[in-house]
């Protein structure tokens, strides 16, 4: 779980990360970074490449789910249940073959995209807090995916 200080940092930086577009731009940037570093992943998601129009749509969905997780920062059980349910839903997308090992490189791309948007506000404490939050979120997603 996250410490009180980590929850505070996440809540404070989320406002800037979400911005006016609820994080959609960060989500798109995250997936472009991820697909540029791992071009073979485009086919897994059914994309023609990083410039595929579906990238922006999926990026917006990813950040919307991060927003849901952030909204449950004070209730870890609820956050885990919600993210596990998202993982279970992804099991139903059988043609996509989403695997647990995709989450770590995706997390690196996400933190990079967040830092790109908020600059210096993504200091060492914020990076640590978001890395811990992403580990919790992705852990819950993976448990749903593998259930």
Curated annotation (Swiss-Prot):
Site, Causes a bend in the G helix: residue positions: 105
Xref: Pfam families: Globin
Transferase recorded as keyword: no
Binding site for heme b: 90
Coiled coil: none
Molecular function as annotated in GO: heme binding; metal ion binding; oxygen binding; oxygen carrier activity
InterPro entries: Globin, Globin-like_OT, Globin-like_sf, Globin/Proto, Mb-like_M
Record PROSITE patterns: GLOBIN
Annotated keywords: Heme, Iron, Metal-binding, Oxygen transport, Transport
Top-level taxon of the source organism: Eukaryota
CDD domains: Mb-like (cd01040)
UniProt keyword annotation of Cell cycle present: no
SUPFAM superfamilies: Globin-like (SSF46458)
Residues of the Globin domain: 1-146
Other facts noted in the record for this chain: X-ray crystallographic analysis indicates that the D helix is absent, Leu-58 replaces the distal His (of myoglobin E7), His-90 binds covalently to the heme iron, the F helix has several more residues than in mammalian globins, and Pro-105 (G7) causes a bend in the G helix.
Self-association state and partner proteins as the record states: Monomer.
Family membership noted in the UniProt record: Belongs to the globin family.
Full protein name: Globin, major monomeric component
Annotated source species: Glycera dibranchiata
């Amino acid at each position: 779980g996250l410490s009180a200080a980590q929850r505070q940092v996440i809540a404070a930086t989320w406002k800037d990360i979400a911005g006016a577009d609820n994080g959609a731009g960060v989500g798109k940037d995250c997936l472009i970074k991820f697909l540029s570093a791992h071009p073979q992943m485009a086919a897994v998601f059914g994309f023609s490449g990083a410039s595929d129009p579906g990238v922006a749509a999926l990026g917006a969905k990813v950040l919307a789910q991060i927003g849901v997780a952030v909204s449950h920062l004070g209730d870890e059980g609820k956050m885990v249940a919600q993210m596990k349910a998202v993982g279970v839903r992804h099991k139903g997308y059988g043609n996509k073959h989403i695997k647990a090992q995709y989450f770590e490189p995706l997390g690196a791309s996400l933190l990079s995209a967040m830092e790109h948007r908020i600059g210096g506000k993504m200091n060492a404490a914020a990076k640590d807090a978001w890395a811990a939050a992403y580990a919790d979120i992705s852990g819950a997603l993976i448990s749903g995916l593998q259930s």
